[in-house]
Amino acid sequence: MQLSASLTQLIEALRCQPGIGPKSAQRIAFHLLERDRKGGTQLGNALTKAMTAVGHCESCRTFCEQSQCDICLSTKRQDSGILCVVESPSDVLAIEQTGQYLGLYFVLMGHLSPIDGIGPKEIGLDVLETKLAQSGISEVILATNPTVEGETTAHYIAQLCHKYKVGASRIAHGIPVGGELDLVDGTTLMHAFSGRRAVTQD
């Protein structure tokens, strides 16, 4: 069966999503055309609107539809003096959902990866350095992912913090709540042991 040009284009477009291969893209395309054309139209309209309307906060670089996001506009957060550095806007959402962090963010939109041609400027570290050079930030929380690239990025930023005499801390890594030791990888166990805390009595 020879697929039409429009259907082929739709399948190819769906493949741009991470984790979606040729078969999955074909399955989604056929489902939308067979059973959910209204949903497909809504998806197309939402994608078009989002691609046009959603940009980046000029201060923290997360997604927003204004020049600055609500977090950066918060006077209370501005006065906290704390800046949390993350790799992605999805990390901001995850941290915000805990309701425990009340500082500002800086979103890298990636991590250092020289082999892929991603250096400091590609992830906005020149912009971050400008922020550190200005007064107002007392602590930077390094919340990059616990990968080789994430650790390298955190180390680079920690050096920038030291240069401008700004405190830097790394989020703890260890055993997840409800996890079992025999199912945890060696690197995670190593972090858990090195980040252990004393047990005190109340």
Swiss-Prot record:
Pfam families: RecR_C (PF21175), RecR_HhH (PF21176), Toprim_4 (PF13662). Signal peptide: none annotated. Residues 81-176 form the Toprim domain. A zinc finger (C4-type) spans 57-72. GO terms for molecular function: DNA binding; zinc ion binding. Keywords: DNA damage, DNA recombination, DNA repair, Metal-binding, Zinc, Zinc-finger. InterPro entries: DNA_Rcmb_RecR, Rcmb_RecR, Rcmb_RecR_Znf, TOPRIM_dom, TOPRIM_RecR. It comes from the Bacteria. GO terms for biological process: DNA recombination; DNA repair. NCBIfam families: recR. PANTHER family: RECOMBINATION PROTEIN RECR. HAMAP family: RecR (MF_00017). Belongs to the RecR family. May play a role in DNA repair. It seems to be involved in an RecBC-independent recombinational process of DNA repair. It may act with RecF and RecO. This is Recombination protein RecR. It comes from Pseudoalteromonas translucida (strain TAC 125).
